[in-house]
Regions:
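Active-site metal-binding motif and surrounding structural segment of the metallo-beta-lactamase
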Residues: 16-36
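Short acidic/histidine-rich active-site segments
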Residues: 156-167, 213-217, 251-275, 298, ...
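Active-site microenvironment of metallo-dependent hydrolases
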Residues: 1-5, 9-20, 47-69, 73-74, ...
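Di-metal (Zn2+ and/or Mg2+/Mn2+) metal-binding site signature of metallo-dependent hydrolases
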Residues: 33-53
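Generic beta-strand/beta-sheet core signal
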Residues: 11, 72, 100-102, 139, ...
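Phosphate/diphosphate-binding loops
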Residues: 97, 101, 128-140, 183-201, ...
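Metal-coordinating catalytic core of metallo-dependent amide/deamination hydrolases
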Residues: 75-181, 200-211
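Histidine/acidic-residue-rich catalytic or RNA/ligand-binding cores of hydrolases
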Residues: 82, 164-173, 194-203, 220-232, ...
Length: 371
């Protein structure tokens, strides 16, 4: 792979790479390592977090192969966020932070003023490197009024689906009827027997071009033993909650654009362990699909202008993670159709073997912005 000025310029064979390398190129031999796009977090709330806590989060996720983060914060959280980014950039280089402004319970005039106040931090010569404002986050009942603000400011509209998916989906679909070009997403969605993510809703979201961010976190534990049991059941897709794998599989079948890791909690399971869980679940999805929902799907959820961001293609940002792995294969959730293949004509990426007996990949390094 040839990287220049922070962008992927070419991907091909070893022989092709050697033929185009010249004295100006710095050559890194992979020695059997695996290169993948760095992982991206779909939504992580930093409200009420001080700068050291935000910095700890960014560093912990960097060690797990993450570079891009969509962070949910209020105006009062911005100073701590900027401080954390300054420390992080000095040690690791500039991160890729997509900020969604929490506008729940915020009056329209106050929201417009907040967006104007953030513009110098994200757009002009005084801007914080790596920080961009991409959207506003509201409750379902606030979506109609916020949609006008988002459209006028050229921002996406994120609707909170953590407490009621049906209400959030209905609100998003209603907004779409009057605003055909507004970027709309549902965040922190889960499916429960009382509030299911139905196939009908998934089809409607796909047809309306509304993206879906699925939560992968367990609900925060309450003090009672029963609530703790329910929290454990939820992550496994027990009686209290449909598994993430099952929802993702149905969303893929409906053609709904999804991303994983859109959560109401700051910390979520790491990407490789999550992919392994999704592949090995009885209602699982392929490793390729799970990987895409933690990379390319996150950028689509953020309505990235370049549709190929999150994969290795010419003129995409070079957010590259290098991993040490034991073996690669094409993996499907059904072991009867899993197969070993190295034929590039199949255009199916080989990913690390992720069965329960295999070790997870170990991060060796991250390359970003040519660093």
């Amino acid at each position: 792979m040839l990287v220049e000025d922070g962008f992927v310029r070419w991907v091909g064979s070893d022989s092709g790479a050697r033929s185009i390398a010249d004295e100006s190129a710095t050559i890194t031999e992979l020695d059997g390592a695996l290169l993948t796009p760095a992982f991206a977090r779909a939504l992580a709330p930093v409200a009420g977090k001080e700068a050291p806590e935000i910095l700890d989060y960014l560093q912990a996720y960097r060690a797990a192969g993450y570079h891009t983060h969509t962070l949910l914060a209020g105006m009062e959280d911005v100073p701590d966020l900027v401080s954390a980014l300054s420390y992080y950039s000095a040690e690791h280089g500039v991160p890729d932070i997509r900020l969604i402004l929490n506008a729940t319970c915020v009056e329209t005039d106050e929201l417009i003023s907040a967006i104007k106040a953030l513009r110098p931090l994200t757009e002009d010569e005084r801007s914080v490197k790596g920080l961009q404002l991409v959207g506003i986050f509201v409750a379902p009942t606030e979506a109609p009024a916020a949609a006008q603000v988002a459209e006028d400011a050229a921002l996406l509209l994120s609707i909170d689906a953590s407490t009621s998916f049906a209400n959030a989906a209905d609100a998003a679909l209603a907004v779409r009827e009057t605003r055909p070009w507004l970027s709309i997403r549902l965040d922190a969605a889960i499916s429960t027997p009382q509030d299911p993510i139905t196939d009908e809703y998934l089809t409607q979201l796909a047809e309306a071009r509304i993206n879906l961010g699925l939560s992968v976190c367990e609900p925060e534990e309450d003090e009672t033993a029963n609530d703790t049991v329910q929290a454990l059941l939820a992550h496994a897709g027990g009686e209290a909650r449909e598994s993430v794998a099952s929802v993702a599989r149905r969303a893929n079948a409906a053609g709904t654009s999804i991303a994983l890791g859109s959560d109401a909690q700051l910390y979520a399971p790491g990407a490789w362990s999550l992919i392994r869980e999704l592949v090995n679940n009885e209602h699982g999805i392929s490793a390729r699909s799970a990987f895409a929902a933690l990379t390319r799907g996150v950028y689509r959820l953020a309505h990235e202008e370049n549709p190929f961001t999150g994969q290795f293609a010419p003129d995409t940002p070079a957010f590259v993670a290098q991993w040490r792995v034991e073996a690669l294969m094409v993996q499907a959730p059904d072991s009867r159709v899993a197969s070993w293949s190295t034929d590039p004509r199949a255009r199916i990426p080989l990913l690390p073997v992720l069965d329960e007996d295999s070790p997870l990949p170990i991060l060796e390094s991250i390359y970003t912005e040519s660093n």
